[in-house]
Amino acid sequence: MRSIIADSKRLVVKVGSSLVTNDGKGLDHAAIGRWAAQIAALRAQGKEVVLVSSGAIAEGMQRLGWSKRPREIDELQAAAAVGQMGLAQVYESRFTEHDIRTAQILLTHADLADRERYLNARSTLLTLLRLGVVPIINENDTVVTDEIKFGDNDTLGALVANLIEGDALIILTDQSGLFTADPRKDPNATLVAEASAGAPDLEAMAGGAGSSLGRGGMLTKILAAKRAAHSGANTVIASGRETDVLVRLAAGEAIGTQLIARTARMAARKQWMADHLQVRGHVVIDAGAVEKLTAGGKSLLPIGVIGVQGAFARGEVIACVGPDGREVARGLTNYSSAETKLIHRKPSGEIETVLGYMLEPELIHRDNLVLV
C-alpha cells in the first residue's frame, strides 16, 4: 500500500504537545529542529506545508515554574501567553537554519465562524504559502473561552485543512495509529492500515488516550479526519516517534492509519456552515422529514418538527436530530426557538395564522442545510 501523502501537494501537519516538549518540562529544541528539517525536505519536493503545533501551555508552565497543568482558565491563558513567545522563537530559529521564513497565526473558533474573518484568514494563509512561508498555527488560548475554543488541535488541523483546501492532514501523535481495540488492554488488537474517513465503526474503535499535557485522544483524531474529508482532504494518523516520519510518508511509505475521503466534497459555503458555525439548538424531526432531507434533498418544513431544544435566534445554526437521537443535518434556521415551538407540527400554510406573519415557508431552506 502506497502512502497518500506521496501524491499530495498541500499538507497540514499537526504535532501534539508530547512531540515538541520534554514531557511537559519546556520545549524540546532538538525535536523541533527535526520537525523543521523534515518540513524543509518536503518543501524541497515542491510541497506546501502548514504546521499546527501544540506546546505553548507546556512551555509557559516551564517558564513559570509550574509542575502541574493548572485547572483555572486564567492560569491556563497566562501560561499560553508566556509559552507562545518561546514556541514562536524556537520554530523561527530552527526554520531559519534551512533558510525558511515562518509566520505565527493564532485562531479561535470565533475567527472562523465569522464569514469575513474566515475569508481573510484563508486569503492570508494562501498568500503566505505563495510566498514560500511556513505558517505555524495554534489556538489562541490566551483569549479563548469554553464557548469559542476548538477543544484540541486535531480539530483545528482539520478546520485549517478545509480552510486552505489542503490535500491531506497528517496528525502526528505518540501512538502508532488507530487500532481495532486498545492494544494496551487487548493483545489481539491490530493496526487499521486504511479505512474510509467517517466510517461508523471507527469511532467505536477509538479510545480516549489523551495525556495530562494535551487534550486530544484518538477519538478526536477520528472526528478530525471526518471533518477534513468535507473538503476532500485525506488524513494520516501516525506516530511522531517514527524516525523521519514525514519524509518517509512523502516517499510513499505507508505508516500508521490512512483515512480516505470518499464522500463528495462539500460546496465551500456549506462546508463553512458545517464546520465553523456553532450549533445553538436542536430540533427533533420525524422519520418522514429524515427521509426527505437525506434522500430527497428537500428543505425542512415546520410540519416535520416534533420537538425543539435550546434557545436560538433566526439565522443561527441548529441541528436536526432524528427520532433515534442521531443528528442527520444542520442548517441556518428561518425562525427562532420561540417561534419554532409555536409552528412545529403545523403546515406552512398555517404559519401566518399562528405567528401573525410568515418569514419563510421553510424552517431551514435546503440551500442553507448540510447533511452530516
UniProtKB/Swiss-Prot annotation:
Pathway(s) the chain acts in: Amino-acid biosynthesis; L-proline biosynthesis; L-glutamate 5-semialdehyde from L-glutamate: step 1/2
PUA domain location: 280-358
Top EC class, one word: transferase
UniProt GO MF annotations: ATP binding; glutamate 5-kinase activity; RNA binding
InterPro entries, alphabetized: AceGlu_kinase-like_sf, Asp/Glu/Uridylate_kinase, G5K_ProB, Glu/AcGlu_kinase, Glu_5kinase, Glu_5kinase/COase_Synthase, Glutamate_5-kinase_CS, PUA
Residues annotated to bind substrate: S54, D141, N153
Listed GO CC annotations: cytosol
SMART domains, per the entry: PUA
GO biological process: L-proline biosynthetic process
Xref: Pfam families: AA_kinase (PF00696), PUA (PF01472)
Residues at which ATP binds: K14, T173, D174
Xref: PROSITE patterns: GLUTAMATE_5_KINASE, PUA
EC number of the protein: 2.7.2.11
Localisation per UniProt entry: Cytoplasm
Keywords: Amino-acid biosynthesis, ATP-binding, Cytoplasm, Kinase, Nucleotide-binding, Proline biosynthesis, Transferase
Catalytic activity entry: L-glutamate + ATP = L-glutamyl 5-phosphate + ADP
HAMAP family per UniProt: ProB
Family affiliation: Belongs to the glutamate 5-kinase family.
Primary role: Catalyzes the transfer of a phosphate group to glutamate to form L-glutamate 5-phosphate.
NCBIfam families, alphabetized: proB
Name of the protein in its database record: Glutamate 5-kinase
Species this protein is from: Burkholderia ambifaria (strain MC40-6)
